[in-house]
């Protein structure tokens, strides 16, 4: 049976300065409570889906957006009145079988987003998030991470929500290409519309001209501030391209 949300609470499990998991506790309409533990990867996947729907709402015309905000605020108020308590013991003695191993967005068509969570013990749970609940849920997740003094982690996660890395590449002196592939599930591909090829032109330590590049999938096709920001953030994501951080580059972007 699908889990619907009446209220949510979050907390971070950490060991020294290392993030272990985020505890997500959900109060359902009949006041039943469900507790899940999510790693960074699963949190990122959840937030990618949530942010994609928020992006759609931000593109509404003024009247429709106002109507959405009014309805959202009523839902947020109700959720704030139904925050479930997370007990310290639930964090100290976290049940590993409640750890989310994978998360998949299976329905993104109507007012609800439906996720299938595969847990550590192999069982599956269906989680339904209404679009009016998205901001409250996302806010609770980021607040918990920031509250655990892990702001850098929050920034790292949120910097990867508006594009999908697919390839990064170095052009070798002999003309060959050395590249890495980032496999992405179909449901993530469906959140983005445009393939962009990015070429970084720079000089190495000896002053010789070099080229590196990437292929990403984005929501925007036209180069602008959003795409420019993505080309910078790709340097932080990619181990291959990290060497370009702080290096003067000419960047070329083309729709594939």
Tell where the protein language model's regions lie, with residue ranges.
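Intrinsic, low-complexity N-terminal interaction/targeting segments
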Residues: 1-20, 76-115, 169-206
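Extended intrinsically disordered, low-complexity coil regions enriched in Ser, Thr, Gly, Ala
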Residues: 14-66, 111-156, 204-246
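A eukaryote-biased signal for long
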Residues: 166-256
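Negatively charged, low-complexity tracts enriched in Asp/Glu with abundant Ser/Thr
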Residues: 60-86, 151-179
